[in-house]
Design a protein with these regions (language model features):
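Ligand-binding pockets and gating/stacking loops
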Residues: 2-4, 12-485
Length: 485
């Protein structure tokens, strides 16, 4: 069982009792004052160290042999429409313009559109690959990879709005404060590259993800495990680069002095493994000053590779660059890379879904297909789990005439690579795409399956917090064995 040594620190009263016992021994007054002084120093040091959110711990073994070594989560923020992308519904075409039939259980929607007329999909659909998987004309490039994809049409969650939907897909809970899935992976496995974080997050350049850092937070775990926001242009990690007027040798000497002071402070605290880990993290942060810029330096890539990701075209350049960065990061041993597309809920098509999704699909389809192609060419797809999806899907009922409302009762995600049996469609929604009805997979089930593929048993991945065992799946979830190769 992976149980953190940091989750149950000694209480303040325990520390006081220790001091009282020490005052009964020779030199107790000096010792007491020393401890008290060091206590204030410890508070200052802790404040400094708590700001270090860059690095995971040293790599460890999981609970069972892993199918995947790394994860790339392609998060389409705002809620892409499953019934216009991966889940064709002939019955919806037949019932177009009619109210929801009484045979379908109504749902609660944020905008109250459950009585609005049903809206058919305007997309054309085609079967692709040996698997004959249906994909709409909005995703022609991704469609070429269906034999590598396991398309899950029966996902569901509890988030009605973007804030709680995004929060649940990232942390398992609609309420903030819990560790993100990437943080659990970082906690359970650490990093393979001691010069890079275990968990990296890349947002769109021109948008801010709803909830912000809460989505990649470590919650009640040490901040070491949270995601590091990496920027695809300029300094990859803010405040990491050394000041331009300070020579590298001078900076290294200063770092060594601080390390020596920290080690002296630690001498009487040999059991404080968290302090030791934070001290070591400064050494790793120093290494990152050279490693991180190299990881984002795309000048090392060939022109054909840049074209593969669509970096040569305006519409696909930003997300294409981010997808290529994801490949470069997992190639360097980063465990979990999360890319946000449509940051700021731009997939949220309450109106004008044709224009909205046409634009967003065009900017993401080619880069995603390029990522899958490149991972396979580099021999990385078998060891990299690629996940695509958003916080929920969209309703078959119309909103404002030409849009769709939120639908967390049934939506589509897909996975590829890393132990996934591709070329299959798992589960289904009802005839109009409103409810998941067959092989339903809750967010907790998705998380349990993702953890399983990377070598972690979601029941055994435990962190002790305030005296109770906490799990990523909150004591729920089951692994979807159909998905696993």
């Amino acid at each position: 069982m992976l149980v953190s040594p940091y989750g149950t620190p000694a209480s303040f009263s325990t520390r006081n009792r220790n001091l009282i016992m020490e005052t009964q021994s020779p030199f107790s007054r000096r010792k007491m004052l020393q401890n008290a002084g060091m206590g204030f120093g410890s508070l200052a040091l802790q404040a400094m160290l708590s700001q270090n959110r860059l690095l995971g711990m040293q790599g460890t073994q999981g609970h069972h042999p892993a199918k995947a070594k790394s994860i790339i989560f392609l998060f389409m923020e705002g809620g892409p429409s499953h019934i216009d992308l991966f889940d064709p519904k002939p019955k919806l075409q037949e019932l177009a313009g009619q109210p929801l039939p009484s045979s379908f259980k109504p749902i609660i929607t944020p905008m109250g559109e459950y009585n609005a007329p049903l809206m058919p999909s305007k997309r054309s659909w085609k079967q692709y690959g040996q698997s004959g998987t249906w994909v709409s004309d909005w995703l022609p490039h991704t469609a070429q990879h269906v034999d590598d994809l396991a398309i899950i049409r029966s996902c569901w969650g509890n988030g009605l709005n973007h804030s709680n939907g995004v929060c649940q897909m990232n942390t398992g809970s609609t309420l903030g404060g819990r560790p993100s899935l990437g943080a659990w992976v970082s906690y359970g496995l650490g990093t393979e590259n001691q010069s890079l974080p275990a968990f990296v997050v890349i947002e769109d350049d021109d948008g801010k993800v709803i909830n912000g850092p809460r989505n990649w937070s470590a919650g009640f775990m040490p901040a070491t495990y949270q995601g590091t926001a990496l920027h695809s242009a300029g300094d990859p990690i803010r405040f990491l680069s050394a000041p331009k007027d300070i020579a590298s040798e001078r900076q290294n000497n200063k770092r060594k002095l601080i390390e020596a002071l920290n080690r002296k402070h630690q001498a009487d605290r040999s059991i404080d493994s968290e302090l030791d880990a934070r001290i070591r993290s400064y050494e790793l942060a120093y290494k990152m000053q050279s490693e991180a810029p190299d990881a984002v330096d795309l000048s090392q890539e060939s022109h054909s590779t840049l074209q593969l990701y669509g970096i040569d075209e305006k519409e696909t350049a930003v997300f294409g660059r981010n997808c290529l960065l994801a490949r470069r990061l997992v190639q360097r041993g980063v465990r979990f890379v999360q890319l946000y597309h449509g940051s700021g809920s731009r997939w949220d098509a309450h109106s004008g879904i044709e224009k909205n999704h046409s634009t967003l699909c065009k900017s993401s389809d080619r880069p995603i297909a390029g990522l899958l192609t490149d991972l396979k060419q580099q021999g990385l797809l078998d060891s990299t789990l690629v996940i695509w999806g958003g916080e929920f899907g969209r309703t078959p009922m119309s909103e404002k005439g030409d849009g769709r409302d939120h639908n967390s009762n049934g939506f589509t995600m897909w996975m590829a690579g890393g132990g996934v049996r591709g070329g299959q469609t798992i589960g289904s929604t009802d005839e109009i795409g409103l409810h998941a009805v067959e092989d339903r997979l809750h967010v907790h089930d998705l998380h349990a399956t993702i953890l399983h593929l990377i070598g972690l048993n979601h029941w055994d991945l435990v962190y002790s917090h305030q005296g109770r065992p906490e799990r990523a799946t909150q004591n729920e979830g089951r692994v979807c064995t159909k998905l696993i190769a």
